Amino acid sequence: MFLLYEYDIFWAFLIISSLIPILVFFISGFLAPISKGPEKLSSYESGIEPIGDAWLQFRIRYYMFALVFVVFDVETVFLYPWAMSFDVLGVSVFVEALIFVLILIVGLVYAWRKGALEWS
């Protein structure tokens, strides 16, 4: 029980920092004026009246490229701390990082072979 005593400040900070945005959200909902009408339902384009329909369909290719970007961006986030402490960690961690990169490369080659990355 004495070990948890050191984390009291952390838990208090976590609870307070979680409650403040929730309280602000609910307070703004209660204090904000409620006005319903056709102007509230229209889309806003920098003060200009919208022309045409505001809903556009994006091609699935955009999402595939975004997904591949996110995967390799997260890979960079994981590999950067490893690269900074490579001399301390040793060879076993190098092998683990190599396996991690190889798994991602296999996934990239699979997506490439399936044609998921072709723009046509």
UniProtKB/Swiss-Prot annotation:
It is a multi-pass membrane protein. NDH shuttles electrons from NAD(P)H:plastoquinone, via FMN and iron-sulfur (Fe-S) centers, to quinones in the photosynthetic chain and possibly in a chloroplast respiratory chain. The immediate electron acceptor for the enzyme in this species is believed to be plastoquinone. Couples the redox reaction to proton translocation, and thus conserves the redox energy in a proton gradient. InterPro entries: NAD(P)H_OxRDtase_bac/plastid (IPR023043), NADH_UbQ/plastoQ_OxRdtase_su3 (IPR000440), NDAH_ubi_oxred_su3_sf (IPR038430). This is NAD(P)H-quinone oxidoreductase subunit 3, chloroplastic. Belongs to the complex I subunit 3 family. It is an enzyme of class 7 (translocase). It comes from the Eukaryota.
